[in-house]
Structure formats: structure tokens, C-alpha cells
Design a protein with these regions (language model features):
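Walker B catalytic acidic pair
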Residues: 263
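Conserved core of the PLP fold type I
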Residues: 80-254, 260
Length: 264
């Protein structure tokens, strides 16, 4: 008997979420897809106009030869395979500080690093992060208010998912910007509010520009709930002056706007 299910119900490009179709993540977009195909053509010996493809679409230093931080890799290897610590020649292979750090982590992770942790992250790591922030900034940090994420993208998605309720909620994004933000806003159904960095002033952030962006959004019925401040800038690389940061904080306090400080 022929399946009576309508073809319209089969998952395809036309009936998936239109928010997914509309999301544009330029750093992994069409140009990157084409470049990937060209790289495969080169590997397969097909004739092309190039003999090598260099991907510069994302910050990926190890892909172009940067060595990973040795300490982290060494500690990770011991934590992943604790049996190495029992080897009589361990001190010939691993530095003393690496061995001590690995033992400390293994003591705190009673069931091993393969077990699920607290949703915020391991408690002892949260305390270490809080202590680091306090030493760096001179301001006491509460470890209960710290969340560890699997990279910045997950943290950004978690936060935007929390504040975006409908298409009347807007987020101020710098132009130029890192396209992850606009792509996520499309997926979540929020509204992008552009504010433009001043190229003539080293890609600085003008408070007057923020005022205009907020006023324009509110005139259209959009509620500016948050602002993304990327510092150092991505892709511009500029660093905000301290006074500029203070101005932004005061402005957001007066306008009841949440600051997303992207300081990767």
C-alpha cells in the first residue's frame, strides 16, 4: 500500500524552520563552502587555479601553525589518563607543576572528568575563576554568579536565549560585528539594532551613536534589551579607552540596557 503521508511533511529545505534558513553566519558561509570544495579538489588531484587554500575566515591560530599551550595539554593528558601518574618515570616526562596541578584536579573530580559536572561547571574551578577575577580587577567576584561554557559561542547563545522573548526585543550590535550575534538573533526571533563604530576615530564607540540607535529602535516599537560591546573589537581589533567604557556603562544604566561584554 502506498504511503499516504503527504510529501509536504517530509523534512526538506522548504519546510524546515525559516529562522534557520534566514540565519547567515558569514564566517562559515558560502565562500567558505566553496573554498572547502576547492581544497578537496586540490587533494584529489583535480585541476584548479590554485595549489593551496589558506582559511582566514575565523580566528584559528593552530590551523596555521601556532603551537598549543604546553601546560594545559600536559595537565589534560594526566587528568584524562591518571594511570600515567603511577609510572616511575613520570618526573622525567612531566614538569613538577603539571603533576601537582593534575593531582589537585583529580582529587576534586572524585568520579573523573568523564562524569557529568554541575551545570555551571566544577565548583573548585568556579572558585579559581572568581579568585582570578578578584586579583585582576580588585573587585570581589561571587563564584555562584559564574558559568563556564564550552567556548564563547555556547555562552552567547545561552544568554541571548534568556533575554529574547519575541521580535519586539532588540539587541544593539556593533557594525562591523562578529556575525554569530546576528545569526543567533535570527534563530531566536529577536531584532538586530545596528550601531556603527567610528572608523575615523580608530573604530571608537560614540555615545551619540548609541543614543540615536536606541531612539530609532524605540520609535519602531522595538525594546532595546541589551547591547553587545566587543572589546577588543572583532574584526576591527580596537581597544576601548577606560573613559569610553565608563560612558557606555552610565548610558546603559540610565537606559536599563543589559551589557554583554565580549572580551575574548
Amino acid at each position: 500500500m502506498e504511503n499516504s503521508q503527504s510529501k509536504e511533511n517530509i523534512l526538506n529545505i522548504d519546510n524546515i524552520s525559516q529562522k534557520v534558513r534566514g540565519a547567515e553566519y558569514a564566517v562559515r558561509g558560502e565562500l567558505v563552502t566553496i573554498a572547502g570544495q576547492m581544497e578537496r579538489d586540490i587533494e584529489e588531484g583535480k585541476r584548479t587555479d590554485f595549489d593551496k587554500i589558506v582559511f582566514c575566515n575565523i580566528g584559528n591560530p593552530q590551523a596555521v601553525g601556532q603551537k598549543p599551550i604546553t601546560f594545559m595539554r600536559q595537565v589534560l593528558s594526566l587528568v584524562e589518563y591518571p594511570e600515567l601518574l603511577k609510572n616511575e618515570n613520570i618526573n622525567l616526562v612531566y614538569p613538577k607543576d603539571v603533576i601537582e596541578r593534575a593531582k589537585e584536579y583529580l582529587k576534586e573530580t572524585k568520579f573523573g572528568v568523564g562524569a557529568y559536572s554541575n551545570s555551571q561547571g566544577f565548583y573548585f574551578i568556579l572558585k579559581d575563576v572568581a579568585n582570578f577575577i578578584e586579583k585582576r580587577d580588585g573587585y570581589k567576584a561571587d563564584h555562584n554568579n559564574i558559568f563556564l561554557s564550552n567556548g564563547a559561542s555556547e555562552g552567547i547563545q545561552m544568554f541571548l536565549s534568556t533575554i529574547i522573548r519575541n521580535n519586539k526585543d532588540g539587541v544593539l550590535l556593533p557594525i562591523p560585528q562578529y556575525p554569530l550575534y546576528s545569526a543567533l538573533l535570527t534563530l531566536l526571533g529577536g531584532t538586530k539594532i545596528d550601531y556603527y563604530l567610528d572608523e575615523d576615530k580608530g573604530w571608537g564607540l560614540s555615545i551619540e551613536e548609541l543614543k540615536n540607535a536606541v531612539s530609532s529602535a524605540r520609535a519602531k516599537g522595538i525594546n532595546p534589551r541589551s547591547i553587545v560591546v566587543i572589546n577588543p573589537g572583532n574584526p576591527t581589533g580596537q581597544c576601548l579607552e577606560v573613559e569610553n567604557m565608563k560612558e557606555i556603562i552610565k548610558f546603559c544604566h540610565n537606559e536599563n540596557i543589559i551589557i554583554i561584554a565580549d572580551e575574548v
